[in-house]
Design a protein with these regions (language model features):
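Conserved beta-strand-loop-beta-strand hairpin that lines the nucleotide-binding pocket
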Residues: 1-36, 78-155
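STAS-typified acidic loop motif
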Residues: 36-46
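Short coil/turn residues that cap or connect secondary-structure elements
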Residues: 41, 57-61, 82
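Histidine-centered phosphotransfer motif of kinases
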Residues: 65-83
């Protein structure tokens, strides 16, 4: 993803920021499966996002791990980003390349972000789950829009 995310327009309706991505690492194969979908920023929509990713990745060994990670990232978009404002949305993308590497992204409308839960907090561990399951992951963007992404290499 390019640094342009910070200056990108805000998501509206079915609009989304087209990712500017090349291969994740030198020598990676081109995409063989790619899909994206826009979801209303409502808690129930996180379940639909999980089903969407599960459908795109059906039959792949790492599908369950990616579905769990997308669930965590989509929940963050719904609960903690500006997407939660009236009419807000988030976008989920899933990509599988010819080498079997999976990439998933959740894009939201950005806004303030505090990713450091207190020691005694009951919530706020989703990114730790993503970090534990993903081969690589990260977050880019800021107040105008944010993309949380993860990659899993084939087992």
């Amino acid at each position: 993803m390019s640094a342009a995310v910070g200056t990108a327009r805000r998501l509206t309706g079915t609009d989304f920021l087209a990712p500017e991505r090349g291969p994740s690492a030198p020598g990676t194969a081109p995409a063989v499966a790619s899909a994206w979908r826009v979801f209303a920023a409502q808690p129930l929509q996180v379940a639909y996002a999980r089903r969407f990713v599960a459908g795109v990745l059906a039959g792949l060994r790492a599908a369950d791990d990616v579905v769990l990670c997308v669930s965590e990232l989509a929940s963050n978009a719904v609960l903690h980003s500006s997407s939660r404002e009236p009419g807000g949305c988030f976008v989920v993308r899933a990509l599988v390349n010819g080498a079997g590497r999976i990439r998933a992204e959740v894009e939201d409308r950005g806004g303030p972000w505090d990713c450091d839960p207190g020691h005694d907090e009951e919530h706020g561990r989703g990114l730790l789950i993503v970090g534990g399951l993903a081969t690589r992951w990260g977050i880019s963007g800021g107040d105008a829009g944010r993309i949380a992404w993860l990659e899993l290499d084939p087992a």
